[in-house]
């Protein structure tokens, strides 16, 4: 088996990546496959932190446009990420992976409150740490959470799992001739206005020199290939 090129990673999974063909909720089969792929990394000695989105259950920004207070909507979205985190933790447990769920705010009896030093300790013990509830503040996306937590835990890279094979020059769903980039600099992403993640999250990663790799989590084995250094997906640094 190929050796990993990263010691510690932060894996960002969108809520949409967890939903099945009906486009809503959580598909247990997808969740279990992701848990098995994460288990492979743990068995290779990689320390894994995970940030989950909540878009499969709730989108605060969308309802804000319909008149809901944005702060209320974002709080509901944060709780959706906790629900996804609970599902992921359960799936990892069933795969015999030791995992800990942390929330950015207190949810006594459900999960631990985020604590930086405790998270580092658990990662060193080869426990998967799932970070939920975003940053704990409204107006920040889970992409921002992924970059923030990645920087805090001193991850080697943020791995952004998507439904496409990486970063393209245009939408591959609309243009079959879309070009896939293998390597990009932070400046190229901004200059070309490529949709990698929201600007706040991206500039946070850039300012702290945090590499980002974008890949297709729907492709079996892609996560392992990214971690072992193949040219899977797009690398931004």
UniProtKB/Swiss-Prot annotation:
Name of the protein in question: Uridylate kinase
Organism placement in taxonomy: Bacteria, Pseudomonadati, Pseudomonadota, Gammaproteobacteria, Pasteurellales
Known EC number: 2.7.4.22
Region (Involved in allosteric activation by GTP): 20-25
Subunit field text: Homohexamer.
Transmembrane spans: none
One GO molecular-function entry: UMP kinase activity
Homology family: Belongs to the UMP kinase family.
Pathway: Pyrimidine metabolism; CTP biosynthesis via de novo pathway; UDP from UMP (UMPK route): step 1/1
GO biological process: 'de novo' CTP biosynthetic process; UDP biosynthetic process
Binding site for ATP: 12-15, 55, 59, 162, 168, 171
Catalytic activity as recorded in UniProt: UMP + ATP = UDP + ADP
């Amino acid at each position: 088996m190929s050796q990993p090129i990263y010691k510690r990673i932060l894996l960002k999974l969108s809520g949409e990546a967890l939903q099945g063909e009906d486009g809503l909720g959580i598909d247990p089969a997808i969740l279990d496959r992701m848990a098995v792929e994460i288990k492979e990394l743990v068995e290779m000695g990689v320390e894994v932190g995970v940030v989950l989105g909540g878009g499969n259950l709730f989108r605060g920004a969308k309802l804000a446009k319909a008149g809901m207070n944005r702060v209320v909507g974002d709080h509901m979205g944060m709780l959706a990420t906790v629900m996804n985190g609970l599902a992921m933790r359960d799936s990892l447990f069933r795969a015999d992976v030791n995992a800990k769920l942390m929330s950015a705010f207190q949810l006594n009896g459900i999960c631990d409150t985020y604590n930086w030093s405790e998270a580092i300790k658990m990662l060193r013990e080869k426990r998967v740490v799932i970070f939920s509830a975003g940053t704990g503040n409204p107006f920040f996306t889970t992409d921002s959470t992924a970059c923030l937590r990645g920087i805090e835990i001193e991850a080697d890279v943020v791995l952004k799992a998507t439904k496409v094979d990486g970063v393209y020059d245009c939408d591959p769903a609309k243009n079959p001739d879309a070009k896939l980039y293998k390597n990009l600099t932070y400046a190229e992403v901004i200059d070309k206005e490529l949709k990698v993640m929201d600007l706040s999250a991206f500039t946070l990663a850039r300012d702290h020199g945090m590499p980002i790799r974008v890949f297709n989590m729907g492709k079996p084995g892609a996560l392992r290939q990214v971690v072992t250094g193949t040219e899977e997906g797009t690398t931004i640094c």
